[in-house]
């Protein structure tokens, strides 16, 4: 406040009555500070006097303060977030969440409640249980995609809003599928009686129009009914093992080509009764009676297509005790506290062309496969290894030029026959208290380590320890590369091509069209095209190409290749050499068709391609077509 006088005087201010709806600070100089009471709006006032000291003249005045209304935010919080994390999934299509909320400016009836899952609005119903409390029920039945998503429970007063959030697994597209279960495998799966079994089939990751094209089916096997005795139900054990496995893959060194590349579909019995839909059991093989039976006549693999016909990979998680196994695209593992280790291992076989790196006493000859995996070899020269591009120094190769050993905090060594004096590099790092702090990066490198499943001696693996030996949730650089190649293949680069000749108005063939049905991120992958081994950069990242007929009607070789920009796949790939990329593991032969007799007479990698009509190669990171234009 301020007063003026018509002559020089000293003005002294005094508060005569203070405010009633706030705190007023008033000084003798007339400066004021006012803080309204919480949630007050309206008018408040105070009175003061001002005195001209030399004249002893006093005047009084009253000041009115107007406090404008400000909308206060509503507040909401979930009463519990128990089990709302990445170790659990929401199976119920209509889950309910208890909330506590408040809003100074509005009654409960003035508030609205909503929910968002993965940025997608979902229908909600709010039920009040008492003042400031209630239940918010969600309708997740129409959720378009599944996955590990963030969810928000929201309250609004029409102007402002507040939310509480959590992150957990949401499923989608849940349906009930009825499958005929064989009653007696001894009479064959194509004869005898069957019993219909109902299974819930749902997406755990993906669904709808998603980027990933590797459809991975998980099947719950031999689950018993809940005994309701306080023990963990089998269905809970299955889901826990399932989520641990998916989380492990998402956290692994293969995550770059797992997360987003895989759609996960789950099948579990509606009424668990302890039976096995695919007739899973052990005892089929004399070399190990504990391994699960998996041959074509040993399990009823047709039920997997009945559950989900578009599966690319199948993992059966079973309550039956046994040793994990993989054959082709199907693997079986026991539901147990470390299921994720077995699953990552078996998935390496199914998806990434990985072999076993552990030593075995299985009584069978497996030497045929010693060189037919991305990660096993009988080659002893590092310069000739199929994984040499991952070796930092070919003159100082881990495993060959220096010995790596697994060490404990007390200084002892795990490796048989070794001690600290014979080891050049100790694998584990420990602090002064004996706590392991990590892996020694000098030891955990790609090299040439002797011993794997195909032989203890004269057989080699690329790293000291990976999941393909077991016990560590890491694939290693070579195996992660194999995993990435499998994912890239499934995006359509391997078998997604459609070809046709292009003709002019007279019917003469003027070109050859290759149309590739692929899905990829150009920030991570680059599609390149070649003619007779020479890249045509003008065609980069085009998925439909027409190659013009050459004027001399010669043999022309048309190739497409994927270049991995993430740095995961770095194997050298000369498109004119069928065997340089992991020794041809990921591609077919160059098949050529001679139709001069009226039907195809096939040749394999012929040196003279002019004697054939056309040829093709599948892989390794794309494909190739050869056209002998003189025959077209």
Predicted features along the sequence, with ranges:
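C-terminal edge beta-strand
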Residues: 55-70, 162-175, 573-581, 586-591, ...
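Extracellular acidic, Ser/Thr/Pro-rich low-complexity tracts
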Residues: 1-7, 52, 99-106, 117, ...
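Short pre-active-site segment immediately N-terminal to the catalytic Zn-binding motif
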Residues: 324-344
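Surface-exposed or secretory-pathway low-complexity segments enriched in glycine-proline
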Residues: 1-35, 63-68, 102-137, 164-167
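Proline-centered linker/hinge motifs at extracellular inter-domain junctions
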Residues: 22, 71-76, 493-494
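Propeptide-to-catalytic entry region of secreted or membrane-anchored zinc metalloproteases
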Residues: 171-310, 322, 334, 601
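A short beta-strand micro-motif common to beta-rich folds, especially ectodomain repeats
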Residues: 42-52, 147-157
């Amino acid at each position: 406040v301020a007063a003026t006088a018509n002559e020089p005087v000293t003005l002294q201010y005094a508060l005569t009555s203070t405010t009633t709806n706030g705190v007023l600070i008033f000084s003798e100089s007339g400066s004021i500070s006012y803080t309204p009471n919480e949630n007050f709006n309206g008018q408040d006032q105070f009175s003061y006097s001002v005195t001209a000291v030399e004249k002893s003249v006093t005047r009084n005045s009253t000041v009115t303060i107007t406090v404008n209304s400000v909308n206060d935010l509503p507040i909401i919080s979930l009463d519990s977030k128990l089990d709302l994390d990445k170790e659990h999934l929401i199976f119920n299509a209509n889950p309910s969440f208890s909330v506590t909320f408040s809003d100074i400016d509005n009654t409960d009836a003035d508030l609205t409640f909503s929910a968002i899952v993965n940025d997608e609005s979902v229908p909600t119903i709010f039920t009040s249980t008492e003042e400031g409390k209630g239940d918010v029920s969600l309708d997740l039945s129409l959720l378009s995609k599944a996955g590990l998503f963030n969810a928000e429970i929201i309250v609004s007063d029409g102007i402002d809003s507040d939310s509480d959030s959590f992150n957990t697994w949401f499923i989608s597209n849940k349906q009930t599928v009825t499958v005929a279960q064989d009653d007696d495998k001894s009479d064959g799966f194509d004869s005898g009686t069957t019993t219909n079994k109902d299974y819930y089939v749902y997406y755990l990751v993906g669904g709808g129009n998603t980027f990933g094209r590797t459809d991975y089916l998980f099947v719950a096997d031999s689950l018993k009914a809940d005994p309701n005795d306080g023990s963990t139900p089998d269905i809970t054990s299955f889901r826990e093992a399932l989520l641990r496995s998916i989380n492990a893959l998402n956290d692994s060194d293969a995550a770059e080509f797992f997360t987003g590349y895989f759609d996960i579909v789950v099948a579990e019995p509606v009424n668990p009764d302890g039976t096995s839909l695919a007739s899973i059991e052990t005892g089929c093989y004399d070399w190990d009676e504990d391994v699960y039976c998996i041959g074509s006549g040993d399990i009823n693999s047709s039920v997997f297509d009945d559950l989900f016909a578009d599966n690319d990979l199948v993992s059966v998680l079973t309550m039956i005790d046994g040793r994990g196994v993989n054959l082709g695209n199907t693997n079986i593992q026991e539901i147990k506290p470390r299921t994720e280790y077995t699953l990552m291992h078996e998935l390496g076989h199914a998806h990434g062309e990985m072999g076993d790196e552990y030593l075995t006493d299985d009584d069978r000859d497996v030497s045929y496969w010693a060189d037919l995996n991305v990660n096993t070899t009988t080659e002893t020269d590092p310069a000739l290894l199929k994984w040499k591009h991952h070796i930092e120094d070919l003159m100082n190769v881990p495993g060959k030029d220096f010995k790596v050993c697994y060490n404990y905090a007390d200084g002892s060594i795990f490796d048989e026959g070794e001690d600290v004096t014979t080891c050049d590099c100790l694998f584990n790092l420990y602090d002064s208290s004996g706590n392991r702090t990590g892996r020694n990066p000098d030891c955990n490198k790609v090299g040439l380590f002797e011993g794997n499943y195909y032989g203890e001696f004269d057989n080699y693996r690329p790293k000291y320890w990976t999941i393909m030996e077991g016990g560590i949730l890491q694939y290693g650089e070579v195996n992660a590369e194999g995993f990435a190649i499998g994912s890239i293949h499934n995006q359509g680069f391997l078998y997604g091509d459609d070809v046709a000749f292009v003709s002019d108005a007279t019917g003469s063939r003027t070109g050859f069209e290759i149309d590739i049905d692929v899905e990829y991120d150009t920030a991570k992958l680059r599609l390149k095209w070649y003619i007779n081994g020479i890249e045509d950069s003008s065609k980069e990242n085009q998925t439909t190409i027409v190659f013009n007929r050459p004027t001399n009607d010669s043999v022309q070789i048309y190739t497409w290749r994927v270049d991995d920009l993430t740095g995961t796949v770095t194997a050298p790939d000369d498109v004119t050499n069928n065997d340089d990329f992991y020794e041809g593991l990921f591609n077919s032969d160059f098949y050529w068709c001679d139709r001069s007799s009226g039907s195809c007479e096939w040749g394999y990698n012929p040196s003279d391609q002019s004697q054939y009509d056309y040829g093709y190669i599948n892989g390794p990171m794309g494909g190739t077509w050869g056209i002998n234009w003189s025959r077209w």
